[in-house]
Regions:
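Hydrophobic anchor at the beta1->P-loop junction of P-loop NTPases
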Residues: 4
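P-loop (Walker A) phosphate-binding loop of NTP-binding proteins
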Residues: 7
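Conserved lysine of the Walker
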Residues: 12
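Hydrophobic positions on the alpha1 helix immediately C-terminal to the Walker A/P-loop
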Residues: 15, 19
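Conserved substrate/cofactor phosphate-moiety recognition/catalytic segment
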Residues: 21-68, 73-74, 99-103
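Glycine-rich phosphate-binding loop used to anchor ATP phosphates in small-molecule kinases
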Residues: 59, 63-134
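A glycine- and Lys/Arg-enriched "phosphate-lid" helix/loop adjacent to the NTP-binding pocket
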Residues: 100-180
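NTP-dependent small-molecule kinase module
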Residues: 156-245
């Protein structure tokens, strides 16, 4: 299992598809549609913010914990499906979901007790057991690291209104804080080998040379880990040469 991680607008979904097409495996995307909790979560944020502005310093969003456990459950179900075949690609990591629960807690939308319970649940779910038939962590975690400017440029390009800083200026601070949390998360991550891709340097969507460079970096790591045979690796290398002709 190969898992893609990275902040909003980093290019996770694009690289997930590129990599799955390259390896001939299945892509499993972040569950964002048909989410019954998301609308009431956003409404809960508004209500909690108004209450805090009126002096209720303890006001939280009653749906913050619910939303994150919903994502946790959906993500774990995706892991079980993706694990059924070698080198399937997962769009977003269950591990990085903790970043968003932590952010909700720091912003006052969730309580410290809720965060501790969520964190304990995540760790219990993902704990590797020596007698289990399969492990739950990925064979390789690929993280796309981007700067604030690159993130905003891509957010504008894809045009989701609720992500735009000109629609909601408070997102500027939120995005900067989120970038810092991702930096901390990358430094602490130890559940599997981690490969960091420079999303500022490589435009793997629009530029063929950049795409090949990123693919070769990932595939070299997969060869090293034993997820690709030498013959498979050489076949992919030849395909890259053909692409660049």
């Amino acid at each position: 299992l190969i898992t893609l991680s990275g902040i909003i607008g980093s290019g996770k979904s694009s690289l997930t598809k590129i990599l799955a097409d390259e390896l001939g495996t299945k892509a499993y995307y972040e569950p964002v549609k048909d989410n019954p909790v998301l609308p009431i979560f956003y409404k809960g944020n508004e209500i909690a913010a108004k209450k805090r502005a009126q002096g209720d310093k303890e006001a939280t969003n009653p749906y913050a914990y619910l939303l994150q456990t919903y994502f946790l459950n959906r993500r774990f179900a995706m892991i079980k499906k993706a694990m059924q075949e070698d080198n399937n690609i997962l769009d977003r990591s269950i591990y990085e979901d903790e970043i968003f629960m932590k952010m909700n807690t720091e912003m006052g939308n969730a309580t410290e007790v809720e965060y501790d319970i969520y964190r304990s649940l995540l760790h219990n779910m993902m704990e590797e057991l020596p007698y289990a038939a399969h492990k739950k962590s990925p064979d390789l975690m690929v993280t796309i690291k981007v700067s604030y400017d690159t993130m905003i440029e891509r957010i504008i390009k894809r045009g989701r209104e609720y992500e735009q800083v000109d629609q909601d200026p408070s997102l500027v601070d939120y995005y900067h804080r989120l970038l810092k949390q991702y930096d901390v998360w990358m430094q602490k991550y130890d559940a599997s080998p981690l490969l960091i891709i420079d999303g500022d340097k490589y435009d793997f969507v629009a530029n063929k040379e950049d795409r090949v460079s990123v693919l070769e970096t990932i595939e070299s790591k997969l060869l090293e880990l034993g997820n690709l045979t030498k013959a498979q690796y050489e076949q992919l290398q030849q395909a890259h040469l053909d692409l660049l002709k």
